[in-house]
Regions:
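Thiamine diphosphate
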Residues: 1-111
Length: 112
């Protein structure tokens, strides 16, 4: 969850940027690395099996990044869970950026 400082900086300095968040609700890069290394070393490391859970999950509760962004003056939309909602949200976000404000679109993706 490295987002808050970036949101604040863009708001503070009036930077009209578009942030499309790939929200997999965790740091799954580390999960994949641990799984890859455990396979290489012939060990069992999978989510919830023998060795226990691996990786960092940022869920339950899920962070509402769009509300965090809005609290700092951003235009924000999300969470986008249905792919059919993405195009309209991006069009609205681009319009907000063209109007001079930062915009965030929180897009939920598969946790991997």
């Amino acid at each position: 969850m490295y987002v808050p400082g970036s949101l604040w900086t863009a708001a503070r300095h009036n930077i009209p940027l578009l942030a499309v968040m790939h929200n997999n609700r965790g740091y799954h890069q580390e999960v994949m690395h641990v799984q890859r290394m455990s396979n290489f070393r012939n060990r069992v490391a999978s989510l919830g099996n023998d060795m226990g859970p691996i990786g960092t999950s940022i869920a339950n509760p899920d962070i509402e990044y769009e509300k965090l962004a809005q609290s700092m003056g951003w235009w924000a939309k999300g969470p986008i869970k249905d792919p059919s909602e993405l195009s309209p949200a991006l069009k609205e976000a681009v319009a907000a950026v063209k109007a001079g404000e930062p915009a965030l679109v929180n897009v939920w993706t598969q946790p991997r």
